[in-house]
Amino acid sequence: MSTRGAGTSGGERPHARVRREPTLTTFGIEEEFFFLDPDTMQPADVAEHVYRRLAVDPRWQDVTMREFLASQIEHASRVFTDMTDAAAELHAFRREVAADAGRYGVSAASVGTPPDAHAFPSITDNERYHRVVRDMAGIIADHQMSGLHIHVGIPSREHGVAALNAVRPWLPLLTAMSGNSPLWRGYDTGYASWRTIQLRRWTTSGCPPRFTDAADYDRRLRQLLGIGGTADLALISWNVRLSEHLPTIEFRMADAQLTSDDTLLIAALCRALVMRAVEDVDAGGTADAPRDAVTASLAVDLPPELLSAAIVHSAHTGLGTDAFDPATGTLAPAADVVRRLLDHVEEQLASTGDREFVHDLVERLLRDGTGAARQRAAWQKNGIAGLRRLYAATIASPPYVRRSEPTAIDGPPSAAASASTPA
């Protein structure tokens, strides 16, 4: 429940189309990790010991966070503009987590839910967390989950609301691509992301509504405070929201990912979607009416109940069969919808040099399956022993990042010239 992210700044920009240099939109990554009993795959409450060691290490003291559960630790990354830098830091931190797991005789896993769970979790000793337990009561018994959160820098909250509106139609697909929680309390749920289903119990969850502008967003959030356990704005649990203390938009739909490559793929796609939305606004659109006709149709024509249903569908099927296509509002072969997303953000991926590695990782994802598919295969083949081997092989596996040189593209100057903001 802690945050780290990235900020951007930008001034007025002409509407004339010019040749511009590659954008450097900033981003930050929050990864949550479980420590698990290797014999039962239930959470193991050793995170405080790990935190105390990393919190005094100069390399990690600013990016290591306690989390809600006593079996969790969080890496809240530094601010990045380059995926290769992010890959290096994610891999290094995961190596630390894996090493500490070995010291304490437990397994470290980056998964959305533990394969098995205690009747009620051990909570980190923090007054705010204890208040959440009091307010949410029985919901907390099943709130044993880890997520991946991606912060992307925005030049203003108006741009942020425009981006929020523009990315809503893609949330079902991003949910399908990032599903990594098929197991719960010792059985296969049949879902790719059981965490997504569990989170629907909270007062605010799933796809956020559309907003007309930043003032509308802020007014409606304030109305939620004090209702249904929403004691503060950090408890707004939509799949995507604006940060309240950083100039970022925060994606929250993803389960914690098995490998750093899985994380980097989601981060690159989230950044590209935000860049696309910001560029559309700077080309003459508004938060509620992007100038680009395709983006506008994606944002306006899909009713909230359809997006909500599509997210549940994605949580169930992952990429195994079909996926929700935001261009048609219907289901289509999952691989086709993934490639539609790549087409949608092709220019943005090229401008940051991420296109080649994203395409490579997408092909790997479509070939090998999501984290949920890989967990399910290990579980079905060898039970707990199979999961133990999978987690050991993936927690600190070396990342694969093939980064091409950024390319200048024709368009208005980007609103995403970066200026990092510490958390």
Residues covered by each model-derived region:
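Metal-dependent DNA replication initiation modules
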Residues: 24, 111, 115, 131-148, ...
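Short, surface-exposed, charged/polar-biased interaction segments
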Residues: 50, 54-57, 89, 96, ...
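Surface-exposed, low-hydrophobicity interaction/linker segments
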Residues: 102-126, 215-218
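Short proline/glycine- and acidic-rich turn/helix-capping motifs at secondary-structure junctions
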Residues: 114-118, 181-192, 286-304
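An acidic- and aromatic-residue-enriched active-site/binding cleft used to recognize and process polar
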Residues: 38, 78, 106, 111-116, ...
